[in-house]
Regions:
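Beta-loop motif signature
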Residues: 28-64, 93-135
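Generic "edge-of-domain/loop-turn" microfeature
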Residues: 6, 40-42, 63, 73-75, ...
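Boundary regions of SH3-family modules and the immediately adjacent low-complexity/disordered segments
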Residues: 20-21, 69-95, 142-172
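Sec-dependent N-terminal signal peptides
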Residues: 4-13
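Sec/Tat signal peptide C-region and signal peptidase I cleavage site
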Residues: 15-19
Length: 172
């Protein structure tokens, strides 16, 4: 039995770790998301997430509720309708940077390398991607809660747009 167990453990250790998914509140829903003690609308509200909130690791789910990591060892539940599942990527472009292209493209029109550039992210920059909004090879980027860009006055600038998948690699 021990002889069989060791190779299985070794094989499992060699498998790549699955990248984590995270929750980010939908700022256009009602501006916030309640995190509850249990997966129902009658349970105690532990905290409220808003547009300034950073992403929270998704630990699991129960129906349409997501169990997320709060600070320390605390966890809570948030309804999936209150936000987005995001995945972390790193800009890793042969060109040294990746362009974030304009998100507002006419319905039915493809995003192309000729679409308006909103900003350019240097290699090594963490990029939050919302998979449900991807369009083919173009991944939907948001800096909500991370605010990696600043405006000319030094204030946080909210940017959303598309980055070609060839310019990114999955992180976490």
């Amino acid at each position: 039995m021990k002889k069989l167990l060791f190779p299985l453990l070794l094989a499992a250790a060699m498998l790549p770790a699955q990248a984590a998914d995270y929750f980010l509140p939908d700022i256009e829903c009602d501006g916030s998301a309640n995190v509850r003690a249990a997966p129902d609308t009658h349970s105690k509200i532990l905290t409220e997430l808003d547009y300034r909130s950073t992403q929270h690791k998704i630990l699991g789910g129960q129906g349409k509720w997501l169990r997320i990591q709060l600070n320390g060892s605390r966890t809570g539940y948030v309804h999936q309708s209150q936000g987005y599942i995001v995945q972390n990527y790193i800009v890793a472009s042969p060109d040294g940077s990746a362009n974030v292209r304009h998100e507002r493209v006419d319905v039915g029109q493809p995003i192309t390398g000729q679409s308006e550039i909103l900003t350019t992210l240097p290699n090594g920059t963490r990029a939050q991607i919302i998979p449900k909004s991807n369009r083919g090879d173009w991944l939907y980027y948001t800096n909500q809660g991370a605010y990696t860009e600043k405006d000319e006055y030094g204030n946080n600038e909210h940017i959303e747009g598309y980055i070609h998948k060839s310019q990114l690699r999955r992180a976490d």
